[in-house]
Regions:
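Acidic/histidine-rich catalytic neighborhood
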Residues: 56-114
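Regulatory modules associated with amino-acid/nitrogen control
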Residues: 91, 95-407
Length: 407
């Protein structure tokens, strides 16, 4: 499981594991969580039954038995939620907290998730996965302790941020307030007030020009590229093309249109080993320079890098599965794409979206060994969901054809 000497790699898990009232329940859940695999049915529920029999045979209390069984059934829940859901959405946190119910279960589940991810493939445990799980844990804990703590309206988020900003010069605060007038509510819905304060450092210097900044939140998380530029066709595809050509991993994107004809995009990045790209490193400086040069052009022509698939990946054959649903609350279409990982995958996906006039509003990227599971929130050029069935079917068909090509 988790060793004390691993404090540097698993700081939160190392802290929590010492607070578990009965660590043996974590051990039993760890032993039985995958025992049902390969037996022709839902492995989690089968594992629950087998673990329950073990607990009964060894005279566990009913409460301890329920805890073990709950952990076995839900052992994938935290990993899936953190990887695939929008953790800035209060409803996501609320739903997860209602499933977990107690702080004790949350602590057990976090420790089991960390152990499971690391034991399955040590390379899957990186700064990005660690930060996602930590964020989900922290927000869920806040919800369990105070159900109103994470649900701030855009207006409340702005007010909290302004309170912190008051320590800055009044000229800076005034500039930030003026800049905020150009944002729609989605910007304030997607970030907490601490993030708004962090962004304000850069927003206070905004002019009518392209701005690219590498933001380091803290030493435990990955870097984010903040990009302010004219909002026009091909902005995101241009960014992805440059990231791909620089061999930089793209993990998450939040894209915001502004009332003044500009856009503000946030892209979470890492190097090829999954580690942070430091703000003043040579690769970061090269990235910033190339992005500014490309985005300063009046007409954007994204360069899609075509690279051969590594030989070792050709031995894995993952069928492409594309699923979608319309989200009328956010006025976009969510598209989940599961396919084989390969060089240039994101650029290929972006090209299909580009060819069909689809605008990407959000993206979440997840890679599991040779398999990629990516989520994109897209709209039509009219900023509406892709509701026309024939257009959506053509997009999906072309995406399938593109991703099925042998490289």
């Amino acid at each position: 499981m988790i060793l004390r000497k691993s404090n540097d790699i698993y700081p939160l898990a190392t802290k929590l594991v010492t607070k578990l009232p009965k660590i043996e329940l974590l051990y039993i859940a760890g032993l039985y969580h995958d025992i049902g695999k390969g037996r022709g049915s839902d492995h989690s529920n089968l594992g629950k039954s087998i673990a329950g029999k073990f607990c009964t045979k060894h005279l566990f209390t009913d409460e301890d038995k329920k805890t073990v069984q709950w952990l076995v059934v839900n052992h994938l829940l935290m990993s899936v939620k953190s990887q695939k859901e929008d953790l800035s959405d209060p409803q996501v946190i609320s739903d997860f907290a209602k499933t977990v119910k107690t702080k004790e279960r949350l602590n057990y589940l976090y420790c089991l998730t960390v152990a499971d991810v690391s034991a399955t493939n040590p390379n899957l445990w990186n700064s990005w996965n660690a930060s996602l799980l930590s964020e989900l844990y922290t927000k869920t804990l806040e919800y369990l302790e105070n159900k109103n703590s994470i649900i701030l309206s855009p207006k409340e988020n702005k007010a909290e941020a302004l309170m912190l900003l008051e320590t800055m010069q009044s000229k800076v605060v005034s500039k930030v307030k003026n800049t905020w007038k150009n944002f729609y509510s989605d910007y304030f819905e997607n970030f907490n007030y601490r993030d708004l304060v962090l962004h304000a450092k850069y927003l206070s210097t905004l002019e009518d020009e392209t701005l690219v900044e590498i933001i380091e939140k803290n030493s435990d998380s990955l870097s984010t590229v903040m990009i302010h530029t004219k909002d026009r066709a091909n902005v995101f595809a241009t960014i992805i093309g440059i990231l791909d050509s620089e061999n930089i991993n793209f993990l998450d994107a939040k894209l915001f249109g502004m009332r003044n004809g500009y856009c503000l995009d946030f892209i979470t990045i890492s190097d090829q080993s999954g580690q942070m790209i430091k703000k003043n490193s040579s690769i970061a400086n090269s990235l910033v320079t190339r992005l500014i040069e490309a985005l300063d052009q009046e007409t954007l022509l994204p360069k899609i890098v075509q690279r051969r698939q590594p030989r070792y990946l050709k031995h894995f054959n993952t069928d492409t599965i594309i699923e979608y649903k319309h989200d009328m609350t956010h006025r976009w279409t969510e598209m989940d794409i599961k396919t084989s990982d390969r060089p240039g995958l994101l650029a290929s996906i972006c090209k299909v979206f580009l060819d069909h006039g689809a605008l990407i509003k959000k993206a979440r990227i997840a890679t599991y060994g040779e398999r990629a599971e990516d989520k994109f929130c897209i709209t039509s050029k009219e900023n509406t969901p892709f509701l026309k069935k024939t257009e959506l079917e053509k997009l999906i068909n072309d995406m399938n054809v593109s991703l099925s090509k042998k490289k």
